[in-house]
Amino acid sequence: MLLERCVSETPGINGGYPVVDGTRTPVRVIVEFVRQGADEQHLQRLLPHLTLEEIRCALRYYETSPARVDEDIERNARAWNELQSRPWPA
């Protein structure tokens, strides 16, 4: 599967950062699961809507464009930290 056919960046979807084409699954999610030790079979169980080919393609995309995906990981982490720092409504 060609990278340009399996990963897309569309304004308004995941902030324009890369997602598996035809889904709203960010490439960063797959990369973060792999960093936590998930193998391909585990990824298929965690993300059953993705084919093994789509998972592999997303990982190849990361190999060729790590800065873009890492930027999305950092952006997501900052957003999460900001949410965690807000007081919960009573």
What are these regions (language model features)?
Residues T25-A90:
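Long, charge-rich, low-complexity alpha-helical segments
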Residues G22:
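Anion-recognition interface
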Residues L3-V19:
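Short, Lys/Arg-enriched N-terminal segment that forms or immediately precedes the first helix
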Residues M1-L2, P11-G12, P26, N76:
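A generic short-segment signal for beta-strand/edge and adjacent turn/coil regions
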